[in-house]
From Swiss-Prot:
Reaction catalysed by this enzyme: alpha-D-glucose 6-phosphate = beta-D-fructose 6-phosphate
Domain of life of the native organism: Bacteria
Cross-referenced SUPFAM superfamilies: SIS domain
Family the entry assigns: Belongs to the GPI family.
Keyword Cytoplasm (UniProt): yes
Name of the protein: Glucose-6-phosphate isomerase
Subcellular location field: Cytoplasm
Presence of keyword Transit peptide: no
Entry-linked PANTHER family: GLUCOSE-6-PHOSPHATE ISOMERASE (PTHR11469:SF1)
Function of the molecule: Catalyzes the reversible isomerization of glucose-6-phosphate to fructose-6-phosphate.
The species this protein was found in: Prochlorococcus marinus (strain AS9601)
Gene3D superfamilies referenced in this protein's UniProt entry, alphabetically: Glucose-6-phosphate isomerase like protein, domain 1 (3.40.50.10490)
GO MF entries: carbohydrate derivative binding; glucose-6-phosphate isomerase activity; monosaccharide binding
Length: 527
């Protein structure tokens, strides 16, 4: 068998389908030969063994000396201890019961009013996971209304507070931070808490924490008597937290089926434990990534779900794939600069945008098409003008147009989008990421680059405080004056700090020209 993208035999030979999951996976439009597949099958013997060790509780995040246990969340019986399994089941039951009490009105605010909204404060996976849940699954007029603060953009925070101004008293404030020390959710939390208190609105009795036991956030929520604290286990990373409290609480508050979501993820986990390469969808999917990128991530992943409800999925995968696989070193300490860049939006919108380049421009990508076979139960569509059939036609047409130019793609087909299938889809990509990491000998569960970024940001914040304090004391200062007091290597950061602090601010007198940083002299004139 050759690498022909349009080979019917290849399509039939590599099409995967599972009747319990009702999911299809087609990797036939990836360039590979039967010999290449055979070589990978041999490698997967070790991959399967490594994943088994991870699931059994091996220390997988070496930097933080912790296990990686998101697979246990959907099947507590495989967790390494009965205590962990019992805690997982208790957390699920607690969230389910809490959701029912909120939606039924058994738990109300201090004015005996039923809750109407949720303001979710979390960053990274703590924001993207819940956003994916609500955007994909929430039905009109069902459950609470969700708003998100996933950044410290002052306009975002002020706009959300303005949008909710009439409903803040009936809003649940959910703060997600495993350690409680992540600056972005902490800052947003403090701003909103202060706003509530300054306007005689309740915060403590409306606030919910999702965090580790004993964390800074846990202690704060406990001491201030917040409405509820849900557990976020040490062995759950942010990008794989969607089957933890982080994803289950949104499901409960939009009145969706937690059990079905977990069942879908669990069944996909079980299916991808099969050691038969061609019957393991995560093995096939990760192999396609490996082969199309020559094992070094030479091609970007373009995610195109042909359903609006899955538009957030490309952003979700961007974090899952890039944070997991973007690594400088392999496990042997060698510099490898691994990774797969991910972007995408939705079909058929993208056919009128960057698909032009995908077909006719630089060949540095592969597409992942995601299609759904269901359509809404309604009589508003004419049989001759059914949008579902048009959408399917657009997908198949784009796929065909790409392959005619030898542009590679993968197609995943779901029977329908619901809690069960979304759980399965997420688990499929989680497993594929783990498998790919094993193939290229990197650790998918550490994030030294993220930690380096956090440390650098903390240094800048420290300089911001030093500069502010210096200017408060009075006197005129040039950038050279300031760096000579602190560190001569930070001239550029000091310029950025001064620009953010002083430009357009009447409290500061600025002499010189902003286009010539060395000419600037700044003095605080109003306190």
């Amino acid at each position: 068998m050759n690498g022909d993208l349009n080979s019917w035999d290849k399509f039939c030979n590599y099409l995967w389908f599972d009747k319990k999951l009702n999911i299809w996976l087609d990797i036939s439009k990836i360039n590979f030969t039967s010999k290449e597949i055979k070589n990978l099958e041999d490698k997967f013997k070790d991959v399967f063994s490594s994943i088994k060790e991870l699931e059994n509780g091996a220390i997988s995040n070496i930097d933080e000396n912790r296990q990686v246990g998101h697979y246990w969340l959907r099947n507590p019986s495989i967790s390494p201890s009965s205590k962990i399994g019992e805690e997982i089941r208790a957390d699920i039951n607690s969230i389910s019961e809490f959701g029912k009490q909120i939606l039924n009105g058994d738990i109300k605010n201090k004015n005996n009013q039923q809750y109407t909204d949720v303001l979710w404060i979390g960053i990274g996976g703590s924001g993207l996971g819940p956003l994916l849940i609500t955007e994909s699954l929430q039905k009109c007029s069902k459950g609470l209304n969700f708003s998100y603060i996933d950044n410290v953009d002052p306009f975002l925070i002020s706009e959300k507070l303005e949008e909710l101004s009439e409903k803040l008293s009936t809003t649940l404030f959910v703060v997600v931070s495993k350690s409680g020390g992540t600056p972005e959710p902490r800052i947003a939390m403090e701003i909103i808490k202060s706003h509530c208190e300054n306007n005689s609105l309740e915060w403590n009795s409306n606030a919910i924490a999702i965090t580790m036991k004993g964390s800074k956030l846990f202690k704060k929520a406990t001491s201030e008597n917040w409405l509820k604290i849900f557990n976020l286990q040490d062995w759950v990373g942010g990008r794989t937290s969607i089957t933890s409290s982080v994803g289950l609480l949104p499901l409960a508050l939009i009145n969706e089926n937690i059990s079905e979501f977990i069942r879908g993820a669990s069944l996909m986990d079980e299916t991808t434990r099969i050691r038969d390469f061609k019957n393991n969808p995560a093995a096939l999917l990760s192999s396609a990534w490996y082969l199309t990128g020559d094992g070094i991530g030479k091609r970007d992943m373009v995610v195109l779900p042909y359903r609006d409800r899955l538009q957030v999925f490309s952003k979700y995968l961007q974090q899952l794939v890039m944070e997991s696989l973007g690594k400088k070193f392999n496990r042997n300490g060698q510099v490898v600069n691994q990774g797969i860049s991910v972007f995408g939006n939705k079909g058929s919108t993208d056919q009128h945008a960057y698909v032009q380049q995908l077909r006719d421009g630089i060949d540095n990508f592969f597409c992942i098409f995601i299609e759904l076979l269901d359509s809404p139960s309604t009589n508003i569509f004419d049989e001759k003008e059914n949008p579902k059939e048009y959408l399917s036609g657009f997908l198949q047409g784009t796929r065909s147009a790409l392959s005619s130019e030898n542009r590679q793609s993968i197609t995943i087909t779901l029977e329908k989008l619901n809690c069960f299938s979304l759980g399965a889809l997420i688990a499929l990509f989680e497993r594929a990421v783990s498998f790919y990491a094993e193939l290229v000998n990197i650790n998918a569960y550490d994030q030294p680059g993220v930690e380096a970024g956090k440390k650098a940001a903390a240094n800048i914040i420290e300089y911001q405080q030093k500069v502010s304090h210096l200017l408060d004391e009075g006197g005129e200062y040039s950038i050279n004056d300031i760096t000579s007091l602190f560190d001569n290597s930070v001239s550029e950061p000091i310029f950025f700090i001064l620009r953010e602090m002083c430009f357009g601010n009447d409290n500061y007198l600025v002499k010189g020209d902003w286009s010539n940083p060395n000419s600037l002299v700044i003095q605080k004139i109003n306190s």
